[in-house]
Amino acid sequence: MLNVILLGTGGGMPMPNRFLSSVVMNFKGRKILLDCGEGTQVTMRVNGTGFKSIDIICISHLHGDHIYGLPGLLSTIGNSGRVEDIYIIGPKGIKEVIEGFLITLPYLPYKLNILEDASNLEFMVKKEKMELVEEDEKISSDLSIKTLELDHSSPCLGYSFNIRRGRKFNLEKALMNKVPKEVWSKLQRNEEVSLNGVKYYSYMVLGDERKGIKLSYTTDTRPTEDIPGFIKESDLYICEGTYGSEEDMHKAIKNKHMTFKEAANLAKRGQVKELLLTHFSPAINDPKEFINNAREAFENSHVGSDGEERVLNFKK
């Protein structure tokens, strides 16, 4: 099960009814934060998400409405008692920006691992943290994060998250591979085991991969030809809808953003299950007034609001 909360759905500047861009995902009690606009700490408190269990922070790009909440949040996480490493993923330039922020944070009780312009990352999800691992055919990770270069006025990344579903134990396979019974349980937990000088791997006792959960996130971009394939068959697609009306197309093109209908066309082409729109222009008072513009292209389109939640489950 993956729990998703829209912490902020505004673009440009915070509004009385909308915080700036941020999304938090919770899987097995560990959290991933997508963007960190001004006020993210406040809306996290409002939604009761907690701070200490954030393991990965993914930044789409370096415009202020997506990163100005980061210095304060990093400080608060430090005050929460966290000592485990945190991964920050972002576009080219993210390292320099974080190093600048750290001037105001001379002491943090945890290490920041900054992954700049990374494209394919694999993580194991443990009880106490998420941990970056090397891609290995013998060991299946719990989470993969892929990025895509978008078309904005500064380097910008889209993100796709694939939560893998644990494979079932296969007795026939375990016996065929002559795996001792005493290591079966550890291999089912995806651990590498050595016994009497022989190494055993989880693939020796587990069946075929099962369909997992896919969430994709693209914000602050024009539509590109690569996006539909990148978001293909996502269970949830969170996408910017800066402008509700096609009458604002000239603004969307000039500022390198999207209209509701453009986002919906991408959702349709990508065959996603649900489109959740976010990052609304301050000029839009009620984004729901424009939802039909999206539904003309993709019926299962919804306007996101601060605090809105989705629960994505593995299919039986």
Curated annotation (Swiss-Prot):
Q: Does the keyword Metal-binding apply?
A: yes
Top EC class of this enzyme: hydrolase
The organism's place on the tree of life at top rank: Bacteria
Active-site feature positions: 65 (proton acceptor)
MF annotations from Gene Ontology: 3'-tRNA processing endoribonuclease activity; zinc ion binding
Cofactors demanded by this protein = Zn(2+)
Q: Which Gene3D superfamilies match?
A: Ribonuclease Z/Hydroxyacylglutathione hydrolase-like
Q: Which reaction does it catalyse?
A: Endonucleolytic cleavage of RNA, removing extra 3' nucleotides from tRNA precursor, generating 3' termini of tRNAs. A 3'-hydroxy group is left at the tRNA terminus and a 5'-phosphoryl group is left at the trailer molecule
EC number(s) for this protein?
3.1.26.11
InterPro entries registered for this protein in UniProt? Metallo-B-lactamas, RibonucZ/Hydroxyglut_hydro, RNase_Z/BN
Q: What does the record's cofactor remark say about binding?
A: Binds 2 Zn(2+) ions.
Tell me which family the UniProt entry assigns to this protein.
Belongs to the RNase Z family.
Protein purpose: Zinc phosphodiesterase, which displays some tRNA 3'-processing endonuclease activity. Probably involved in tRNA maturation, by removing a 3'-trailer from precursor tRNA.
**Which proteins does it associate with, and in what oligomeric form?**
Homodimer.
- HAMAP family listed in its UniProt record: RNase_Z_BN
Protein name as annotated? Ribonuclease Z
**Could you read off the lineage of the organism from its UniProt record?**
Bacteria, Bacillati, Bacillota, Clostridia, Eubacteriales
